[in-house]
Amino acid sequence: MRYLTAGESHGPRLTAIIEGIPAGLPLTAEDINEDLRRRQGGYGRGGRMKIENDQVVFTSGVRHGKTTGAPITMDVINKDHQKWLDIMSAEDIEDRLKSKRKITHPRPGHADLVGGIKYRFDDLRNSLERSSARETTMRVAVGAVAKRLLAELDMEIANHVVVFGGKEIDVPENLTVAEIKQRAAQSEVSIVNQEREQEIKDYIDQIKRDGDTIGGVVETVVGGVPVGLGSYVQWDRKLDARLAQAVVSINAFKGVEFGLGFEAGYRKGSQVMDEILWSKEDGYTRRTNNLGGFEGGMTNGQPIVVRGVMKPIPTLYKPLMSVDIETHEPYKATVERSDPTALPAAGMVMEAVVATVLAQEILEKFSSDNLEELKEAVAKHRDYTKNY
């Protein structure tokens, strides 16, 4: 399974193409749109979310509510494009129109300046448009397809925010994936501890009044994972490594950890390793899950627990100093639309990329052209694992 996304933030549409999804997977536009709505939601979102009402359109690969095995093509229309017809025109336009929204003031923390140097642009809008987090719309769409596949294999996935700008959220112990998903969905800030809800919302309001932004930490949990996804035989086949790349590829994400993560560096080995248990009913399990569901780069059957660190959104309404690329004079950076935080939305993106990588691994290990054969192969593997 592989995929590509295309499109610009203010272009006419966003597109994704997925190849390798087995035939026979039940799939509707609403399966995708539900996750797109969640990506646009969350307390603290800004004006762009009021303009766009993202709806996916299938143009190939799905017929009568099921995948055909052919490449799946999905489009999402950018409604805001109508205000940018000249600026984002694919055809050449007059110089006076080109300069209308030309960007020469790179924003600190964005791809603007480095992209301009790399691709030799004199208008940094070219960098801004593709590097925008608007691209994650299609990664959420791809992830929604992957999640439908995982659900058919009795795997479940959820995300929630565990840190808001330095404010840690207390997470009740032993919550199931379903409970995490339910609690986070009921929260405007995607947390599982409802007692902290108003405190976090008040904090976001204050950050907005200050013209500033905050980052934080998002956790994704996956249950029902088969043993043995990934491999130790080569460095690039380790599943936790692939997941780490996927998470850090999300806009503004700067770090990733599994299970205890960096805390493991402060503990003794006896306090970190997960003791192995066995019972006739459950087969092999672990006493704890400090390693986040991985041993040797492979899934061990415990829930996958992965966290991503998101830096504060770099676009500030109190812009930082920058330098004009034409005059080299100091200048306050260009201000585009921004939000005080996008952590709840970022959680949806993280959930999507994790689901996508897991679907890729499933299809690599249990290669099948149709859903029926795939389900049979996974069920057979689960039986073997239990009786090993």
UniProtKB/Swiss-Prot annotation:
Its cofactor is FMNH2. PROSITE patterns: CHORISMATE_SYNTHASE_1 (PS00787), CHORISMATE_SYNTHASE_2 (PS00788), CHORISMATE_SYNTHASE_3 (PS00789). InterPro entries: Chorismate_synth (IPR000453), Chorismate_synth_AroC_sf (IPR035904), Chorismate_synthase_CS (IPR020541). NADP(+) binds at R39, R45. One of its GO terms (molecular function) is chorismate synthase activity. GO terms for cellular component: cytosol. It catalyses: 5-O-(1-carboxyvinyl)-3-phosphoshikimate = chorismate + phosphate. Pathway: Metabolic intermediate biosynthesis; chorismate biosynthesis; chorismate from D-erythrose 4-phosphate and phosphoenolpyruvate: step 7/7. Signal peptide: none annotated. It holds the Pfam family Chorismate_synt. FMN binds at R130, S131, S132, N251, A252, G296, K311, P312, I313, P314, T315, R337. It is an enzyme of class 4 (lyase). GO terms for biological process: amino acid biosynthetic process; aromatic amino acid family biosynthetic process; chorismate biosynthetic process. Reduced FMN (FMNH(2)). Keywords: Amino-acid biosynthesis, Aromatic amino acid biosynthesis, FAD, Flavoprotein, FMN, Lyase, NADP. Homotetramer. This is Chorismate synthase. It comes from Streptococcus pneumoniae serotype 4 (strain ATCC BAA-334 / TIGR4). The lineage of its organism: Bacteria, Bacillati, Bacillota, Bacilli, Lactobacillales.
